Regions:
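Generic structural detector for well-ordered beta-strands
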Residues: 7-11, 38, 54, 67, ...
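Short, surface-exposed coil-to-beta transition loops
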Residues: 3-5, 61-65, 87-92
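Hydrophobic pocket/interface hotspot
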Residues: 16-21, 27, 51, 68, ...
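Short, highly charged C-terminal tails/helix-capping segments
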Residues: 39-40, 139-156
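Hydrophobic ligand-binding cavity/cleft-lining segments
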Residues: 1-46, 155-156
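Short beta-strand segments that buttress and anchor functional surface loops
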Residues: 49-56, 77-84
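Beta-strand/loop substructures that line and gate deep hydrophobic ligand-binding cavities in soluble
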Residues: 80-135, 151
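A short, structured loop/turn motif at beta-sheet edges
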Residues: 14-15, 42-45, 69-74, 94-103, ...
């Protein structure tokens, strides 16, 4: 298993940040691996709710079925996924107040399937995943700190 942890300070309240990042329609706006999702609501996913996401990682396209495992607004959200190619992942978002904003942490633990993909992960995919995760949080900060995101991803 591979673990990638990234953190960023965002000048928005924790509830705003969590509401935005847990609404799947927003994922392609800030995460470079996210191509599309199969939902048409901008609402946060709650425990046991599911979404299918099309992703591209290391040049490989996959469809992942995500299931929410934990939802503690505005502090923590955990989602578990399984790709059609056999890979698995758990993503945990941790949020805490930081001044007038939020300390946001994204913790990704994933495993690819098959010996060939495991080798490619060590040689190639892991580096791309690390870079994509850094870029995702930079883009998230930029999107949420822009003036046009008020009201996006509000809880149901």
């Amino acid at each position: 298993m591979t673990r990638i942890v990234n953190a960023v300070q965002i000048d928005r309240p924790p509830a705003d940040v969590l509401d935005y990042v847990t609404a799947p329609l927003n994922w392609p706006q800030w995460h470079p691996s996210s191509v599309s999702v199969d939902v048409n609501t901008g609402q946060s996913l709650r425990i046991s709710e599911q979404v299918r996401e099309v992703i591209v990682v290391g040049g490989r396209r996959d469809r992942v079925l995500w299931v929410v495992r934990e939802y503690d607004r505005p502090h923590r959200w955990v989602i578990e996924g399984r790709g059609e190619r056999g890979g698995t992942a758990i993503i945990t978002y941790r949020l805490s107040p930081a001044g007038r904003g939020t300390a946001f942490e994204r913790d990704l633990v994933y495993q690819v399937s098959g010996i060939v993909l495991r080798l490619l992960d060590v040689l190639f995919i892991r580096g791309r995943m690390r870079a994509g995760s850094r870029q995702a949080l930079e883009q998230l900060k930029r999107v949420l700190e822009s003036s046009n995101t008020s009201g996006i991803g509000s809880p149901a």
